[in-house]
């Protein structure tokens, strides 16, 4: 059997390097990918620090990682769209093909979803494998080939970019819209970038940290920024050049941001809740009703969101990074070898200035 070095979360505060047998092709449409780049997600840190996110509770060891890209090293006999040597972005959640959610086009809501590095609560069943390993097996249709001018590093950003794609699609972001994005972490910055590529006339990013707001401007994701410590909805609209946002993408889950978003949004606007809260939050339901707003919950990503995300990178970088409208690569602030992966997790957990941290796959 081929060895498969992996990074494993055993329990809270306990990460170790382990070696398992590599997965093998078992279905005609299976593809074996050698993982090359993996990003650290906030959910990884929640499991590392707290052992749970909502109803997902860590009860047994779990291979970490779900933001990954790699190179195809083996394909099943029925695979037609990929070949050995292709670079791919890995979509890490596999639904049941028989679920009503899958059949209705909402496979991200499938109750039987096997999502990489997310605990399986079923007794006696292993956790779905994460992608922070050397080899990862996936169905062909949950891999998206990367164009030649889209790097493997960008491939690892496809997963969080797809979260932004899903949010903008739910909010029907289109030409002429004025979009307010709350939160300038990786998801918020990428959501802002997506809104801009979808044709929004203005995108204002809201946060309480000036260095994060500067990043939003520096990478080209925001036309305007606003530090919410400096005022409320009137000040936000003033900072937006007098434009009232008709779409809000709320990426923090923080109660003050939700309230400010509802206060600032135009009557009849579209409010997309992307961020999760640690616990219950109060919601300004009266203002929401009187403005006749439409609320969307946004969870991960769905059909064609990955392809859309890869398409955004394809178009953005078709003339090289120096001519790219949005400098997504600037979001990658830290890079680590696989042998130093635990150090990378500790850095991100400590909140020491990392925007997006990437880890190389095992050699």
Swiss-Prot record:
Show the Pfam families listed in the entry.
ADH_N, ADH_zinc_N
Which note does the record give on the cofactor? Binds 1 zinc ion per subunit.
- What are the recorded Gene Ontology BP terms? D-xylose metabolic process; L-arabinose catabolic process to xylulose 5-phosphate; sorbitol catabolic process
Is-annotated flag, keyword Phosphoprotein?
A: no
From the UniProt record, list the reaction(s) this protein catalyses: xylitol + NAD(+) = D-xylulose + NADH + H(+)
Q: Which GO terms describe its molecular function?
A: D-xylulose reductase activity; L-iditol 2-dehydrogenase (NAD+) activity; zinc ion binding
| PROSITE patterns linked | ADH_ZINC
- Provide the residue positions that the database annotates as binding Zn(2+): 41, 66, 159
Q: In which pathway does it act?
A: Carbohydrate degradation; L-arabinose degradation via L-arabinitol; D-xylulose 5-phosphate from L-arabinose (fungal route): step 4/5
Per the database entry, which stretches of residues form a coiled coil? Answer: none
Q: Which cofactor does it need?
A: Zn(2+)
Q: Identify which top EC class this enzyme belongs to.
A: oxidoreductase
Q: Which InterPro entries does the UniProt record give?
A: ADH-like_C, ADH-like_N, ADH_Zn_CS, GroES-like_sf, NAD(P)-bd_dom_sf, PKS_ER, SDH-like
Residues noted as binding NAD(+) in the record, renumbered to the chain = 183-188
Q: Which Gene3D superfamilies match?
A: Medium-chain alcohol dehydrogenases, catalytic domain (3.90.180.10), NAD(P)-binding Rossmann-like Domain (3.40.50.720)
Q: Report the EC code(s) recorded for this entry.
A: 1.1.1.9
Q: What induces it?
A: By xylose. Repressed by glucose.
User: Which family would the database say this protein is a member of?
Assistant: Belongs to the zinc-containing alcohol dehydrogenase family.
Q: What is this protein called?
A: D-xylulose reductase
The species this protein was found in: Scheffersomyces stipitis (strain ATCC 58785 / CBS 6054 / NBRC 10063 / NRRL Y-11545) (Yeast)
The major lineage groups are:
Eukaryota, Fungi, Dikarya, Ascomycota, Saccharomycotina
> Coding gene?
XYL2
